[in-house]
Regions:
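A short, flexible loop at the N-terminus of ABC-type nucleotide-binding domains that lies
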Residues: 3-8, 15-28, 78
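Helix-to-loop junction immediately C-terminal to a conserved catalytic motif
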Residues: 57
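Conserved ABC transporter NBD signature motif
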Residues: 65-76, 80-81
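Conserved ABC ATPase signature
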Residues: 97, 138-142
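Conserved ABC ATPase "signature" region
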Residues: 105, 109, 116-134
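Catalytic Walker B motif of ABC-type/P-loop ATPase nucleotide-binding domains
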Residues: 163-167
Length: 253
């Protein structure tokens, strides 16, 4: 599907700080993501990626500024916003003592789906994500890659218009990483806006149309990957990060 001029995400003059100044701080942050876009937010550990996503989803409350998702004001705790977005956190969101089916039934009901919608959607997701053979096993028995697939299924159970993913491929094998990325690409082809974070800059290529680099709570640049590398005459985002910040990009900080 082609990109729309409509904004999926519009953040203006965002201000936020953790009590006691513990953690990243935002001051006057602005960010726009178009509807139907594959958008990647990249930065080292501690840069503010997870905090920004938590503000987008309403898990954290901003001190100042505006956050709108498809025109809805996140700060007003509008229930419609919850139906629009799916969130796949870095920390697992499932109940480990339950099976994939039981988890999807619970989160599907929480999202307001009917029993028939839950059954249809559960069967579909278990098939797509390769979980059919373990549909009734407890999730705590799964490998890390299988757990990531369950986490993703929960995030998309209600067919959200915007899917927000925080490090969805962290700690998985190559096969699972490819399976997750391929599924995300398919969702985007059907119109889902993807907002994706990672500290692995190599994942930007092929997945994200637009990328932003964030460091210490500040978005230092945002554009298409091709434009960024061409404009700054760099071969990689790591080199671009070094040019713009004067710091070597590290994944372990």
């Amino acid at each position: 599907m082609g990109l729309s001029d409509e904004l999926a995400v519009n953040i203006e003059n965002l201000g936020f700080h953790y009590p006691g100044n513990d953690g990243v701080t935002f001051s006057g942050l602005n960010l726009k993501v178009r509807k139907g876009e594959r958008f990647g937010l990249f930065g080292p550990n501690g840069a503010g990626k997870t905090t920004l996503l938590s503000l987008m989803t309403g898990l954290l409350s901003a001190d100042a500024g505006d956050i709108h998702l498809l025109g809805r004001d996140v700060r007003k705790k509008n229930k419609d916003v919850n139906k629009l977005i799916g969130f796949v956190p870095q920390d697992f969101s499932y109940y480990q003592e339950l099976s994939p089916v039981e988890n999807l039934e619970f989160f599907g009901a929480w999202s307001g789906l009917t029993r028939q919608q839950i059954k249809t959607r559960t069967d579909e997701l278990l098939h797509i994500l390769g979980l059919e053979n373990v549909r009734n096993k407890q999730v705590d028995q799964f490998s890390g890659g299988m757990k990531r697939r369950v986490n993703l299924a929960i995030g998309v159970i209600h067919n959200p218009a915007i899917l927000i993913l925080d490090e969805p491929t962290v700690g998985v094998d190559v096969q699972t990483r490819h399976a997750i990325i391929n599924y995300l690409m398919e969702l985007n082809k059907n119109g889902t806006t993807l907002i994706y974070t990672s500290h692995q800059l190599s994942e930007a290529e092929g997945l994200c149309e637009q990328v932003a680099l964030i460091d210490s709570g500040e978005i230092i640049v945002q554009d298409s990957l091709a434009n960024l590398l061409k404009e700054h005459r760099q071969e990689s985002l790591e080199n671009l990060f070094l040019e713009l910040t004067g710091k070597e990009y590290r994944n372990d900080i």
